[in-house]
Amino acid sequence: MVAPAAFGATTADEALLKAYQAFNAGDAISLARYAPALEGSVLEPYGEYWALELRLEDAPDAEVRAFLVKHAGTYLAQALRADWAKQLGKREHWARFERALAPLAARDLELRCYDWAARLARGDKAVAAEAKSIWLEPGDLPAGCQLLADKLAARGAIDAGEVWQRARVLFERGQITAAKSALGYLPRAQAPDELLLAQAATQPQQVLARLPRHFGRRATREVAVLAALRLASSDPRLAAEALEGPVVRRLNASERAYLWSRVALEGARAHDGEALDWYARLGREPLGYDLAAWKARAALRRGDWPTVRDAIDAMSAADSRQPAWIYWYGRALAAQGKREAARAYYQRISGGTDFYGLLATEELGALAAIPAPSFVPSDAQVAAARGIPGLARALELYRLGLRTEATGEWVFAIRGMDDRELLAAAELARRESVYDRAISTANMTVRLHDFRVRYPVPFEGVFGDYARTHGLDEAWVLGLVRQESRFIVDARSDAGARGLMQLMPRTARWVARKIGLVQYEPHDVAEVETNITLGTGYLKMVLEDLGHEVLASAAYNAGPRRARSWRDAKPLEGAIYVETIPFSETRRYVKNVMANAVIYAALLGEPRSSLHARLGVIPAADAGGGEDDMLP
């Protein structure tokens, strides 16, 4: 990892960045050369912290404790303590680990696993039951959790059924290597045939076409279950056919019910018209949240309001209280003529500025009203926020481009702040153009709010200018950028998307050619106006191709081809299209973009905006248009 270069860096800035590079390279000698230049600066503790982190495995406890005392109550002290505790847990120094862990309130999954392992070493018999939840975590387990799993298995606390349960979870997600690793906990005599297991991953239909040898063995039957799961995740219809075949018919009733539940779930996600019929195969089996939610979504697309209610009724009380399901339960009641009962549901979530809060308000006959700021911090209060050491360090780190460290400092510094303090900190971030912190900090208030800070309009009209150039709604563009990057100029995603409008390099080059942006170079995408030029240009092309802001929003996140594929054979209410997007990330994204657009329209002084009107109706899949496969 290489630190970004700071524009106009001073000698102290250069020293900090070179020290950071040395730390990431594990170069203690170079770090020692640059760290003294940090003395007297607000970031002085970082030199000491990085040096100690590099030798934490061998550092004496006394030296670590001295740092923790010297920097007590800081983000760096918490970060060092967490890493120190993990080192002690890794070496199974349980007494020292527990002393190091005790003051830490924030504990990630790995620390929790080491804590369970420490308690297990003390003979705590409650650990096995408490720790089982981590066993079903998808993907590879972190080192501390792997250690815990090894110790539980050695004590016989993980039985064969639980091993196969984890394998099912992983296989269904396509995490085959992790699934094979989990199966390593089985005794050799109970292990599956490796060739059959490999075939279940790559050719599941063949495994299910004829009865494998040794089908009486549990391992062979379980591999058949894994093959059916793998097939269901790629082709629910083929899986449904296989469930009627000779192999699955030999499974027991519980195994068959489980497989039908997965076929129904994947069918609903794929918008298969038979999904609800597959749900019917489950009878009165408990559904669990995902199954119930997707049953409700499948029923929404079919317009089957009684089944929408039944599916929500099948959820736990906590799950059914989510705004989405309160809203759709109200809609189901209204569709069945129970309008007063429906109003009671809408009233439970109306007034909010989230997607379903806005829709519920409109169902009650009103439009969202953005309140005037209930508190605006004075310059003195903002100056006081600037004087908080953690916030001061965060701003310096943001200035130098060390965003991960800066965000850690900021989040730690605002813990426990009241609404006035939060709004002062948010205003400080806004003035310093750290818009993501301004937004997230202002969003944390409980009673006092300032939507001007929650929904900033930065860069002095640039977004409006380019929106008008392309005939786009400025409120929608701002709503999309707020969701994409929180207005972080140098935002970079794990996939490589860059800038305010999070453009992939290939997309940026393609758009630059299309709009005739001469002398475009890949590094230009990080420049504000270039990024907005390319982003709004691409958004215009997507909107022209798909013909609807909802579809264009989905396409901007997940690609035009997917957005088109999620349409129905008949025109579909926009809110139902959004709620039934198969990807949870894209579903949240589109909800937030469209709700943001309503808020921005109000803040920009546009006529009162209806979310229902923005969502509109999504044309049927065969309605014509929207077929430009050239769009990246």
What are these model-derived regions, one by one?
Residues 7-15, 40-46, 58-59, 73-81, ...:
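Generic helix N-cap/helix-start motif at coil->alpha-helix transitions
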Residues 6-50, 199, 370-391, 399:
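N-terminal leader/linker segments that initiate helical-solenoid repeat arrays
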Residues 49, 241, 245-251, 256, ...:
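Catalytic glycan-binding domains that act on GlcNAc-containing polysaccharides
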Residues 34-39, 67-71, 100-105, 131-138, ...:
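Alpha-helical solenoid scaffolds that mediate protein-protein interactions
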Residues 51-53, 65-72, 81-86, 90, ...:
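Alpha-helical adaptor scaffolds
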Residues 31, 97, 127-128, 179, ...:
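Single-residue signature of alpha-solenoid repeat helices
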